[in-house]
Amino acid sequence: MQVILLDKVANLGSLGDQVNVKAGYARNFLVPMGKAVPATKKNVEFFEARRADLEAKLAETLSAAEARAVKINELATVTIASKAGDEGKLFGSIGTRDIADAVTAAGVAVTKSEVRLPNGVLRTLGDHEVHFQVHSDVFAQLNVVVVAE
């Protein structure tokens, strides 16, 4: 199925590219998420007329994401208190939702889907490096300190 991309899609293309994808991928993900439209003659003409607007909107979201990434990097560290045993192991774990809530409480709005844990959930006390993907091209990094309650 031929589609016109309205946004940058990983491993597929960027704004304005006409790509051939499987019909299910287009119907179930790309079109409902607003990332693509079917490449009909009418849609191609409509897209060419709105190309400048879409490029400006894409640049605006990219600059907003870069600003959020700078704010996350400026935080440097976030401290999370959790119950732990004598050897420094946590009772339970700290996942993406807990980290997103802590960063949001510190002043930068972050969703749990933007949190990337390279080594899985946090199960020990101490310093842990956490990555954030605030946009498909923009990444940020933060140090999370887990302390015992």
From Swiss-Prot:
InterPro entries: Ribosomal_bL9, Ribosomal_bL9/RNase_H1_N, Ribosomal_bL9_bac/chp, Ribosomal_bL9_C, Ribosomal_bL9_C_sf, Ribosomal_bL9_N, Ribosomal_bL9_N_sf
GO biological process, one term: translation
GO molecular function: rRNA binding; structural constituent of ribosome
Xref: Gene3D superfamilies: Ribosomal protein L9, C-terminal domain, Ribosomal protein L9, N-terminal domain
Keywords tagged on the record: Ribonucleoprotein, Ribosomal protein, RNA-binding, rRNA-binding
Classification via PROSITE patterns: RIBOSOMAL_L9
Entry's Gene Ontology cellular component terms: ribonucleoprotein complex; ribosome
Family membership: Belongs to the bacterial ribosomal protein bL9 family.
Function summary: Binds to the 23S rRNA.
Protein name: Large ribosomal subunit protein bL9
